[in-house]
Amino acid sequence: MQAQALLHLLQLSSPSLPIGAYSYSQGLEAAIENGTVKDEVGARRWIIDVLHEVVARFEAPVLWRLLQAFETRDAAAVESWTERFIAARDTAEFRAETIQMGYSLGKLCSDLQLGDAEMLALLQAQTEVPLPTALAYAAVTLKVPAEAALLGMLFSWAENQVLVCVKSVPLGQVAGQRLLLSLQAELEVAAQVAQQLPDEELSNWSPGLSLLSMQHEVQYSRLYRS
């Protein structure tokens, strides 16, 4: 990867990217609240389970397909995978999360004038823009290789999950970094699965996670919006 592409990838993966990722836990806060996650071992188990059962089998594969669609400027594919991703957000919090973050990143891309008029039209043609669509657009217009963009997305997701555990379990800073290091091989496997999974095998079937998300909507005390 060229240095410029690497720098763009680091910017897209940075916690300082102004899309509000830090304000969401994707159900993890509810799992901490009910005692499912209460220490470093439980945190690692939770993150790995969600990574392989949900993220690697749906969110990452959809991002991979959107990266290809924007690269080839395939308007029909962009629309189809965007709509499919939104339809798969099965709770109010999960849907609001991806739409808010996608809108913020899409607006940032527009404000920074990333991409030509044809590319921008592909993005703006979507009724709603979830995060994977905006992220794919940003990566393609910044010429970040698809494989790197996919791994960057997975790392950002894992880092955010670890930060939730550090704040809410709570875990120490060293434990958080140890946990993040221990996830590297798992992230590589998830990236490979996302690239190889056929369309008919994509699935976000995770009823337990969905129930936790719904419980989180009425959780009395919380730090996160999901």
Curated annotation (Swiss-Prot):
**Which controlled-vocabulary keywords does the entry list?**
Chaperone, Cytoplasm, Nickel insertion
Gene3D superfamilies in the record: Urease accessory protein UreF
Q: Which GO terms describe its cellular component?
A: cytoplasm
Which cysteines pair up through disulfides? They are: none
Tell me where in or outside the cell this protein is found.
Cytoplasm
Which terms in the Gene Ontology molecular function aspect does this entry carry?
A: nickel cation binding
Q: Where are the transmembrane segments?
A: none
Entry-linked HAMAP family: UreF
> Which PANTHER family does its entry note?
UREASE ACCESSORY PROTEIN F
Q: Which family does it belong to?
A: Belongs to the UreF family.
Report quaternary structure and partners.
Answer: UreD, UreF and UreG form a complex that acts as a GTP-hydrolysis-dependent molecular chaperone, activating the urease apoprotein by helping to assemble the nickel containing metallocenter of UreC. The UreE protein probably delivers the nickel.
Q: What does this protein do?
A: Required for maturation of urease via the functional incorporation of the urease nickel metallocenter.
Q: What is this protein called?
A: Urease accessory protein UreF
Q: Which organism is it from?
A: Janthinobacterium sp. (strain Marseille)
Higher taxonomy: Bacteria, Pseudomonadati, Pseudomonadota, Betaproteobacteria, Burkholderiales
